[in-house]
Regions:
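Long, positively charged amphipathic alpha-helical accessory segments at protein N-termini or as interdomain linkers
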Residues: 11-158
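Conserved active-site carboxylates
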Residues: 8
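General beta-strand structural signal in soluble alpha/beta enzymes
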Residues: 1-5
Length: 158
């Protein structure tokens, strides 16, 4: 699997999972983070709207297997807890390293939509804070903190 910045999990180049977060913070303190995970488990191709069928996938479609949702949840939460404790010990650089290793956005042509508009460019790197750095055709490098980023081609292509 691979991660598409900032919050999509891809399997075989198709979205199988999305992760959303809500954060309450002050300048030097995070009050709380709420994490929502949407995972396509048993959908069949016909369960997706026609416009998503080429871009979406379920675990069952990818593997042909049936998954017990409670067991999936247990494994996800155990892995989440493992990463959380590693973060507490090692800090955000550890998270950033894992994110970079699994990322399929970097080096790819992307279409970016933010509250300030839309543009195309090349995804260069994740900043130390986790922002996506994108080079526009003009050469300007833009730091994306939030927005919709779409890969312009299949991420398996070179």
């Amino acid at each position: 699997f691979a991660l598409k910045w900032p919050n999509d999990v891809l399997l075989d180049g198709k979205k199988v999972c999305g992760i959303l977060t809500e954060l309450s913070a002050e300048i030097e303190k995070i009050n709380y983070v709420i994490v929502g995970i949407g995972l396509n488990v048993h959908q069949k191709p016909g369960d997706f709207p026609p416009e998503l069928r080429e871009r979406a996938l379920s675990l069952k479609m990818a593997t042909g297997r049936f998954f017990r949702r409670a067991e999936l949840l247990r494994k996800i939460l155990a892995h989440y807890e493992e990463l959380y404790f590693a973060y507490l010990e090692q800090g955000f650089p550890m998270v950033l390293q894992v994110w970079r290793e699994l990322n399929c956005t970097l080096g790819k042509e992307v279409s970016v939509t933010t509250t300030e508009g839309s543009f195309r460019g090349t995804a260069l790197e994740l900043s130390e804070g986790g922002c996506l750095l994108v080079r526009k055709a003009s050469g300007e490098i833009v730091k994306i903190m939030a927005g919709d980023v779409t890969l312009c081609c299949d991420y398996f292509d070179n």
